[in-house]
């Protein structure tokens, strides 16, 4: 498009287009969900329409369209670092509730993309669900290039998010060109689903056929529905042709306001620099985070949310405190930040007029939070300076500062990133500038005083992260809830060896807002018992579930003092009453096997692969085992098989296990491995040491098998890179989980392998790379190797299919071309039926380059649509002063058509075939040629 569309114009074009297709516009709803406990925030365009799709409410129309404001915070750390991550964004959508389905949805999609937004079909790529041939054919029919359409499996093209309608989907991608393809990989990026900034998904169209109850139980919908989503910010980025979403008009003018008050400037060219300056990267991140987070907070407060220590309030507090940190670094005062707020509201008030009405409330709320932030920073730096006056700061000091005194974790992460990259003078200075930008004291802090082992800090922080991620609603509570922090000493104990308790006394009750109560009736709550059999999430092991009396226990975490807090659904309790508890024995038994297997796998990695392997973290649940470790290369399949074999060998020994209580020195003397030594040193009593076998002795507080034979079976199921030198290995144990994996995942992999060769045989093409895998003994190789081979075969077969299609197309094109060129007249009319449009076009291109003095008028009727093409050789048209657009206008007027094109080739559609009128056109051309 000649003029770049603004974000507001793009939104209006979308809504106006669908209103022209008889859709009713639904206003953008509040970010705070109404009557939907499954969501903390509205996080998608369809989230506010779920009751319409389920049939619980009648929609205002069967066809709906909207631009829904959304908020997601699951990857907040990526904001400002990647091109497209946001906390706040708008999702454009069109919806059909029991009205149109695939055909119309794809027709609308093609028309909007190709004709309204005028995106070049050559730059559009499509994915469809592998079993959805109808969508594939519809895209081809509506102008998509066949070779640009990729069939994908369920993981990529089956849409579901939480509870509600779901089904197969088709996605539209846009190719932004080589300047966004730094490695020059081309289409490989799209076809192999490699993360990139070149091929960007802009629209997802979901064919809703099922309802997910939130527990992956699917039922057929009584009526077929369509729901779609297109990110407004992404569309703006593409239509405005800028490097990132943060370079679109909605961000640029806010950035200018920040620059007005800061001594730092945003670097517009940084994206394209191959070697990025660390200070520029940090400065750009500051700008983007401030704008993104402020926008999210402005909308959320205007919708009724307020900062606090829990749930939505905690999210707002975190977003604001991150913003304040980066404002400090850019030296922008709170007073000047008011203009940032005003500008964001001005950008959005046309479509969201309610923002202007809430301006004063927003500013006052943010000011209160800023005052609390300053108080927190003052307290944390006071403690930091006390520590620095006594000694150098180590990892445990820093951990305590963050978790107890509220020192910003973002500062720690920035220091870690800079100081582990390179300790050159520039990075050291930047690190000092960052920490001192929020330092309220005139006395500057020197980086030389911070002797921090960041790896050790990460280990200390692992458990904190695990609990926070396990229950996002209590993340803020664990750090800041005074009621829990100030719990009195309680006589409460956990017994590893029992699976039920009788007559346990209720010591404490908290309601769902973490307020202590004496009694609770039929409400979600947290309780502490004097004795419990429920294991609490700790050390990477998932908590037990079960029942207290008749009430479900769905989570168990530890209080800051170590008491087990049981989350109970709709419980009825009062302090002092006696209750019975029973864990889910099946799940506990599985987790025992999983945890013991993780120890054996770790030991086997060190012995089979290398003693230099260093564990970074682990997680054990009833579904899988994950173990993160550092190593300088990827494991070979032979090594993975060796690890499996070694773990199975120890299982087969049926070695009795032991739990020993030892001091730290005693544990180390017997060869026990431990990863939290700084924590263990603070424990005055004895430590729990698990002895599985001579090869595996670890300090551990988890639940384990009593005999290695109890594990039954073991299998490695995954190996992925987490970054340079960091790996994650996944596994399962027990007959139950291994058999489940074999019957579901491995069986499918074997079926896929066989199907690829079946397809290869059908193609009747010989390929050396495919032939190489033909004799693979899939029973003797590891599943992960089979998975890799399948990926190679999948890509290779797809390439061969495209090659075959091109060969067939070329052959058919030549056959039709020959029919065209047999004619020796200067003009000729051809009436055809059911010829593929692309095939016809290719044939005519060949024909006009062979029969260089002939004008062709071709009529082709396909599925009731009458297509015309009028063309000749380009030089012939030019030499004879022919402009076929003039004849196309005449043809359109007489036969109810529309179309046009270049001077030597025009195409379009007509409503009827009238040979007399068509020949008149050719007669006119003939007359001009004489």
Curated annotation (Swiss-Prot):
Cofactor binding note from Swiss-Prot or TrEMBL: Binds 1 zinc ion per subunit.
The reaction(s) this protein catalyses: tRNA(Ala) + L-alanine + ATP = L-alanyl-tRNA(Ala) + AMP + diphosphate
The keyword RNA-binding is annotated on this UniProt entry: yes
Coiled coil regions in record: none
Compartments in which it is found: Cytoplasm
Entries under SMART domains matching the protein: tRNA_SAD (SM00863)
EC numbers on record: 6.1.1.7
Top-tier EC class: ligase
Source taxon at top rank: Bacteria
Gene Ontology biological process terms from the UniProt entry: alanyl-tRNA aminoacylation
UniProtKB keywords: Aminoacyl-tRNA synthetase, ATP-binding, Cytoplasm, Ligase, Metal-binding, Nucleotide-binding, Protein biosynthesis, RNA-binding, tRNA-binding, Zinc
Annotated GO MF terms: alanine-tRNA ligase activity; aminoacyl-tRNA deacylase activity; ATP binding; tRNA binding; zinc ion binding
Cited HAMAP family: Ala_tRNA_synth_B (MF_00036_B)
General function of this protein: Catalyzes the attachment of alanine to tRNA(Ala) in a two-step reaction: alanine is first activated by ATP to form Ala-AMP and then transferred to the acceptor end of tRNA(Ala). Also edits incorrectly charged Ser-tRNA(Ala) and Gly-tRNA(Ala) via its editing domain.
Domain statement: Consists of three domains; the N-terminal catalytic domain, the editing domain and the C-terminal C-Ala domain. The editing domain removes incorrectly charged amino acids, while the C-Ala domain, along with tRNA(Ala), serves as a bridge to cooperatively bring together the editing and aminoacylation centers thus stimulating deacylation of misacylated tRNAs.
Family the entry assigns: Belongs to the class-II aminoacyl-tRNA synthetase family.
Name of the protein in its database record: Alanine--tRNA ligase
Species name: Malacoplasma penetrans (strain HF-2) (Mycoplasma penetrans)
């Amino acid at each position: 498009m000649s003029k770049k569309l603004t974000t507001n114009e793009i939104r209006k074009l979308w809504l106006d287009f669908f209103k022209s297709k008889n859709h009713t516009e639904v206003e953008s709803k509040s970010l705070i969900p109404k009557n939907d406990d499954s969501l903390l925030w509205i996080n998608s365009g369809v989230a506010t329409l779920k009751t319409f799709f389920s049939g619980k409410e009648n929609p205002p129309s069967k066809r709906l369209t909207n631009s829904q404001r959304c908020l997601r915070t699951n990857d907040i750390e990526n904001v400002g670092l990647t091109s497209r991550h946001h906390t706040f964004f708008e999702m454009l959508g069109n919806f059909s509730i029991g009205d149109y389905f695939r055909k119309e949805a794809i027709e609308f999609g093609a028309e909007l993309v190709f004709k309204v937004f005028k995106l070049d079909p050559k730059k559009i790529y499509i994915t469809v669900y592998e079993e959805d041939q109808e969508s594939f054919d519809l895209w081809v029919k509506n102008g998509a290039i066949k070779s640009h359409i990729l069939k994908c499996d369920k993981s990529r093209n089956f849409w579901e998010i939480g509870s509600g309608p779901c089904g197969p989907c088709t996605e539209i991608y846009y190719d932004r060109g080589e300047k966004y393809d730094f490695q020059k990989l081309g289409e490989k990026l799209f076809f192999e689903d490699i993360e990139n900034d070149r091929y960007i998904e802009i629209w997802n169209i979901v064919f809703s056929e099922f309802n997910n109850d939130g527990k992956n139980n699917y039922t057929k919908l009584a009526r077929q529905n369509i729901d779609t989503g297109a990110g407004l910010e992404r569309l703006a980025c593409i239509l405005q042709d800028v490097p990132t979403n943060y370079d679109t008009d909605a961000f640029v003018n806010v950035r200018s306001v920040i620059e007005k008050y800061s001594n730092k400037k945003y670097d517009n060219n940084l994206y394209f620099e191959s070697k990025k300056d660390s200070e520029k990267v940090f400065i750009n991140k500051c700008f983007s985070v401030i704008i993104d987070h402020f926008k999210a907070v402005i909308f959320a407060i205007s919708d009724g949310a307020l900062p606090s220590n829990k749930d939505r309030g905690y999210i707002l507090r975190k977003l604001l405190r991150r913003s304040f940190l980066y404002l400090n670094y850019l030296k922008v005062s709170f007073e000047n930040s008011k203009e940032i707020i005003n500008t964001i509201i001005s950008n959005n008030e046309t479509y969201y007029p309610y923002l202007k009405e809430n301006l004063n409330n927003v500013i006052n709320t943010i000011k209160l939070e800023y005052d609390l932030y300053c108080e927190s920073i003052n307290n944390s730096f006071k403690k930091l300076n006390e520590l620095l006056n006594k000694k150098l700061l180590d990892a445990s000091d820093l951990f305590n500062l963050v978790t107890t005194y509220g020192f910003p974790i973002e500062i720690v992460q920035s220091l870690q990133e800079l100081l582990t990259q390179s300790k050159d003078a520039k990075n050291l200075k930047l690190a000092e500038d960052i920490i001192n930008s929020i330092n309220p004291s005139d006395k500057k802090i020197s980086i030389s005083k911070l002797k921090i082992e960041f790896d050790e800090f990460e280990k200390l922080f692992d458990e904190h992260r695990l609990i926070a991620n396990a229950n996002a609603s209590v993340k803020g509570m664990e750090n800041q809830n005074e009621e829990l922090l100030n719990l009195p000493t309680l006589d409460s104990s956990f017994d590893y060896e029992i699976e039920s308790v009788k007559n346990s006394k209720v010591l404490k009750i908290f309601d769902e807002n973490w307020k202590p109560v004496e009694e609770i009736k039929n409400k979600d709550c947290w309780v502490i018992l004097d004795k419990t059999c429920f294991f609490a999430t700790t050390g990477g092991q998932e908590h037990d579930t079960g029942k207290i009396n008749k009430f479900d226990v769905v989570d168990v975490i530890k209080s800051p003092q170590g008491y087990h807090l049981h989350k109970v659904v709709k419980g009825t309790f009062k302090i002092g009453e006696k209750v019975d508890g029973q864990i889910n024995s099946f799940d506990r038994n599985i987790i025992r096997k999983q945890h013991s297997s993780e120890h054996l796998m770790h030991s086997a990695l060190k012995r089979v692969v290398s003693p230099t392997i260093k564990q970074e973290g682990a997680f054990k649940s009833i579904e899988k085992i994950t173990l993160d470790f550092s190593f300088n290369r990827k494991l070979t399949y032979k090594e993975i098989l060796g690890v499996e074999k070694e773990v199975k060998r120890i299982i087969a020994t049926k070695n009795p296990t032991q739990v020993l209580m030892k001091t730290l020195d005693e544990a180390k003397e017997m060869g026990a491995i431990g990863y939290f030594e700084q924590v263990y040193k603070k424990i005055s009593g004895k430590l729990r040491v698990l002895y599985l076998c001579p090869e595996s002795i670890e300090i551990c507080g988890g639940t384990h098998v009593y005999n290695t034979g109890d594990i039954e079976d073991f299998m490695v199921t995954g190996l992925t890179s987490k970054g340079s030198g960091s790996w994650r290995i996944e596994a399962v144990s027990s007959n139950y989980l291994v058999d489940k994996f074999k019957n579901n995942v491995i069986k499918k992999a074997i079926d896929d392998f066989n199907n690829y060769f079946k397809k290869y045989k059908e193609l009747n093409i010989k390929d050396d790379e495919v032939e190489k895998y033909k004799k693979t003994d899939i029973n003797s190789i590891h599943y992960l190797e089979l998975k890799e081979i399948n990926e190679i075969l999948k890509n290779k077969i797809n390439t061969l299919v495209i090659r075959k299609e091109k060969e067939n197309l070329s052959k058919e094109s030549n056959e039709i071309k020959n029919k065209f060129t047999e004619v020796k007249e200067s003009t000729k009319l051809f009436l055809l039926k059911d010829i593929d449009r692309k095939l016809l076009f290719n044939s005519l291109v060949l024909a006009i380059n062979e029969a260089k003095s002939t004008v062709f008028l071709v009529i082709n009727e396909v599925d009731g649509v009458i297509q015309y093409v009028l063309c000749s050789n380009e030089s012939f048209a030019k030499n004879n002063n022919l402009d076929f657009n003039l004849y196309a206008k005449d043809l359109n007027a007489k036969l109810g058509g529309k179309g046009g094109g270049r001077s030597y080739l025009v195409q379009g559609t007509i409503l009827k075939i009238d040979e007399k009128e068509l020949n008149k056109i050719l007669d006119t051309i003939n007359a001009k040629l004489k």
